[in-house]
Amino acid sequence: MDIELVVEDCGFLEGPIAMSDGSIIATEIELGRLIRVSPSGKVSVLVETGGGPNGAAIGPDGALYITNNGGSFHYQRVNGLNIPGPTPPGHKGGCIQRIDLPSGKVEKLYDSCDGRPLWGPNDLVFDKHGGFWFTDHGCTTPDGRNFGGLYYAKADGSKITRARDHMISPNGVGLSPDGKVVYMADTQTGRLWAFDVAAPGELAPPSGFMPGRVIATLPGYQFLDSLAVEAGGKVCVATIFNGGITAFDLDGSTEHFAFPDIVTTNICFGGSDMRDAWVCCSSTGKLFKCRWPRPGLKLNHNA
C-alpha cells in the first residue's frame, strides 16, 4: 500500500474527521487543542479545548463533539518517540465537549454519570437517532485503575447512561452499517467486542458472564486503539506495537496494514468514493493518507 505523508510534528494526533471541503479536523491530545489540516497540508489551530481532546465527531446539529480525557496521560519521549505514560497526579477526570465551529465556543455537556466521574472519555460515534455512543478508557493511578465503560448520551446534554461497566480499557467505538451492532476495541486485551443494540441507546442484555460477543482477540502483545468501519462491515482498528491498521472480518479473521509507527492510533475514511483513508501515527506526530482497498462507511452526520 502506498502512503502519503500529509503533516508531521503534531502533538499526539487523534480523532481525525474527513470534512466535505477536503480538510481534516484532528485532535492534538498532548497540546489540548484541535487543528484543521487543509488539502495542501497547511495546519491551523481550530480551538483550544484544554485537557486531552481525544475522539471527535460531527453531530446532527453540525457541531463538533469531543471526548476529552482531561489530560489522563503524561507524555514522555522514549527513543525519539512520544509515548503516553501514567496518569498525572492532578488528574480529576474528563468530559464530553460540544464545539460550535463558526464561533469556536466550547461547551461542557457531561463530566459524570450517576454521580461517578468520567475518568478518561476516549472515542465516540453518532447513531442515526442523533445520540452518541462513547467509551471511557479509564485511567491508571498509583492506587490502581479507575475502570471505564461504554456509554450512550444525548447531544443536547440532557441524558447520559452507562451501557457496560468495568471494562479493562475501552477505546475505539463504531457502529455496523445497519446500526444494529456497537463495536468496541479494548486496548490492553487486544480484543474487539460486539454489542447488539436492542433500542436507540440501549444494548441487549449480556449473555451469561460475557458483556458482549468477542469478534477476535489479537495474538501476542498487541494493543487496540480507535477504529472505523468499512461499508462492507469489516472493522478497521488502529493497532499498537504491531503498528498499523488491523481489519477484522466478523468471522474473526484479520488483515493487517502496516504503517511506520508502533503507536498507530486512528483511521478515518472520506473522499468521493470513501476509499481515501487518513491514519494517525501518533508517537512520531504524523498523519498519513492512502487509498484503502475497500470503501469506508459514511458516518450518520457530516459537515
Task: For the regions a language model picked out, list residue spans one by one.
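Sequence-structural signature of mature extracellular/luminal beta-sheet repeat domains
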Residues: M1-A303
